[in-house]
């Protein structure tokens, strides 16, 4: 295995990397760094967590040391990723007087303008704010020789493809080295490569380097109304160190977060309506172990680079393979093992098969935990917590109450009663989650008869106030209730599912 010095990295940077604990380059760093130092364009296919920031950042430091003015522009899909990349570049360049400035929305632009006037060598930013500075001419392009697009497919998914083209067109092609990194290569990214890159060197980390050995992928078949109970049972049994839970909508994220909090779990939610200040606060809590469950939409989770995530739960199945790849890529990083569990309604199995076919690997079926397994896991957790509590000094008033109780009750029975209350404390807490329709079957028409409202209540975890009352399966029941849905049906963009027998309404749209 080559070391960094053999790849052409200077002694000063090598010393810094070794002080950071980086003795040897990762596969993508080993393959990319020589080409980057030569000035070749690079097309890298790799997920976050494979060392790709070092793949472009380490050679970039070598190229900008001693230079004046903006030499390099790095585009990232989100503020968080931009800040993370900038921080890593500062670490790589310690003691070498390399200035790195971040520019992104949600922060005062005047402060960024002042920072740009100081002539940093490297600018890291989100596409929208970079264009703002280009239009204001506060970001000059004449000295830029290296353009890097990090997580290009994420930027495309967020609607930045035209912004990326605009920015690439602003930097003279004859002087520009372009490095583009992406976990997936959709058609729009391929077209971008053909239009703006010059015979790029293709660096691709193989699947077995990215996710296969590190992530155990499972699916569990569960009906919508039983999903939350099944999910919390998995949480109790798995006891994840850090978990990210994906919901399909903002409403789902809000309701899931509230439901988890009411059950005693330490959770916070992230979606597009969360303010930047709140978002940073939530991420800080997650990274500092103040919360251990992060509930997020796909958009809100894009660009997150959080180490130590042990579990990813797809509470709602993703609609495409690329989203699935990005979701589960949040765990199993840096050689650590991870677990990804996808909850799937029986009629959504076509989506599981599509993901398996595209990724060329099979997920394992996972049965929901039995009640005995859940209680055993809770008991073990309570036992550990009690041991921690016993190391604390108790307040005198509690000791007095304890003495009074021990006079009245047998000590073993007293402790057993308290433990039982702790183990089952949250079982009776009712939560409310809006019913979400399963995804339509792929390549076939979806009929309403496949979603009749004969699902069981799910231990009282869902609010069924809007559930249709039971009726016969005959035509008279359909006619009786059809008017109730006509108005909503007309609002649907495409042909709706027919209402046969006992079905659910489109609740709380």
From Swiss-Prot:
Biased-composition ranges, Basic residues, are 440-459, 467-482
Q: What class of enzyme is it?
A: hydrolase
**Keyword Nucleotide-binding belongs to the record:** yes
Q: What is its EC number?
A: 3.6.4.13
Query: What is the protein's species of origin?
Result: Staphylococcus epidermidis (strain ATCC 35984 / DSM 28319 / BCRC 17069 / CCUG 31568 / BM 3577 / RP62A)
Q: Where in the cell is it found?
A: Cytoplasm
Residue numbers of motif Q motif? 2-30
Q: Which UniProt keywords apply?
A: ATP-binding, Cytoplasm, Helicase, Hydrolase, Nucleotide-binding, RNA-binding, Stress response
What is the protein name stated in its UniProt record? DEAD-box ATP-dependent RNA helicase CshA
